[in-house]
Regions:
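C-terminal structural segments of small proteins and small subunits
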Residues: 88-94
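Short S/T/G/P-rich N-terminal loop/turn motif that feeds into the first structured element of a domain
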Residues: 1-84, 98-107
Length: 107
């Protein structure tokens, strides 16, 4: 039993966590975008990917600009976002794909 716990602890500490910050324009209102992102099916999808949404915010200077901070396994969110097949899914939320600024950090 002790050996199992030790190996599980090692797995947890060895996994690289990525924090991904997306800054982008919206094609709809911030409230519509936020509602979409917090919807049960959207959150279920993130949960299946091991991704958590830590922050969804609207720019004070431009109400059509939003920032979202995600955290999850390295490359998961980035790879999905960079896949051209994901573009229609991303844009269905109101997120304008073109011009999105992506900042990535690992820990």
């Amino acid at each position: 039993m002790g050996k199992d716990l030790k190996s599980k602890k090692h797995f947890i500490t060895a996994m690289t966590i990525e924090t991904t910050i997306l800054d982008f324009q919206l094609s709809n209102t911030f409230e519509q975008y936020e509602f979409h992102m917090n919807a049960k099916e959207q959150q279920s999808m993130f949960k299946e990917m091991g991704v958590k949404t830590f922050y969804i915010g609207k720019s004070l200077d431009d109400p059509q600009r939003a920032t979202v901070i995600f955290q999850g396994p390295e490359n998961v969110l980035y790879d999905i976002f960079m896949n051209p097949e994901s573009k229609p899914i991303v844009e269905a939320s109101g997120h304008i794909y073109a011009g999105t600024k992506i900042t990535r950090r690992i820990s």
